Amino acid sequence: LRVGPIFRAPNKDYLLPRILIGLMGLVMLGATIPAYANPTSNPGLINLVDPALSLGETAGAFLGRQLTVILVALIGAVTGLRHLVMIGGFGMAFMNGHDAILMGLVGGPDFRVAAIAGLVFAVLGLLSIVLVWRAPKA
């Protein structure tokens, strides 16, 4: 029976993609949590009106989806598990990419900054996937 220390050394594999995913997750978490109190504070929900703006309808589904992807990404960033980092990167890329495209198509000048930020997050999410695509050599 081999007994090791309670706290192991941190996993240093995939450090750059983990930092990217973690920072994106924290930024998105900072935009998502306040939106539960006021859904119109989130750029993706600003055009909704009642009843779709309630948390039991469209706004709640949007925020729930966003929070789920953020939590998966943050868990991947903390644990360093390759597949969770890739899933988090895909979630960030897909969610931010499609939001950016939709905001760019129907948004207008008010959404330009949010659309550009969404595209940047999508590219960073895809970059994190590419960086962990291959397993590290043992």
Annotate the PLM regions:
Residues 30, 54-77, 90-94:
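Core segments of alpha-helical transmembrane spans in multipass integral membrane proteins
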Residues 27-59, 63:
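Hydrophobic transmembrane helix segments
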Residues 37-38, 76-79, 104-106, 131-135:
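Helix-loop junctions at the membrane-solvent interface of multi-pass transporters
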Residues 2-28:
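Cytosolic juxtamembrane helix and N-cap/initiation of the first transmembrane helix
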Residues 122-138:
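Membrane-water interface at the C-terminal end of transmembrane alpha helices
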Residues 75-105:
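Mid-chain, well-packed structural core segment of small domains
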Residues 87, 98-116, 133-135:
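Membrane-helix boundary connector in multi-pass membrane proteins
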